[in-house]
Amino acid sequence: SNSYRYAGSNPNNYICFGSKESTCPEDNLYRIIGVFGEEKHGISGKNLVEIIKSTTLGNYQWNDRSSNDWASSVMESTLNVTYLTNTLSGYEDKIEKVLWKTSGLSRNGVTPQVIYNEEIVNATSTHSAKVGLMYPSDYGYAASPKYWTYKLYASTETEDYRAAAGENWLLYGVTNEWTISIDPTSTSVPWNIGYTGQLYNNASPIAKWITRPAFYLASTVTYESGTGTSTDPYRVG
């Protein structure tokens, strides 16, 4: 599909969103995951820029009960009610409502392409909303391209994404981080990224872990200034 992704240890993909201050406040600093066509977001005929909060919103539960249904989850409402209306107030019209792929990923120990094909290309359910989380495939493709043949989980760290930890800008690396994708072989497990770099399906959704909102900029949003560094992020209007 026609897409562009930022990959490697620290690309110049910073963007200031939701603030006009001359120095972008940390809470308004995001990073561009990439530019994607309909295959990923479901909006026909549009290439959209997807961004993710640079720092964590906090540690949040994926759900408050043993269910991994995204549409009814606590996380979905945390992002699309609390975060969207409070933090992004006045900027909602600059965010595109898209189709998030919610059928998930049924197996671990595979490469980013295998993950992308299952959770994105062959998705069997979607949820229409403005805000979501990153997909495991987003995390996989954020590593330097030489690692794209590695598995996101293996028993040996030289064979999985622990080896790519220093060359993947999406790895937060403090504690585990939630993704939007579920394990459909279970009724209760979402996927998370471990702080050492592996992909896991080992946790209850009630665990409170790093949460970084992700969303797509509306196609009407235009570039204004900036070079994409953390101190001179892209500015949009």
Identify the residue ranges that each predicted region occupies.
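Collagenous Gly-X-Y triple-helix signature in extracellular proteins
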Residues: 1-237
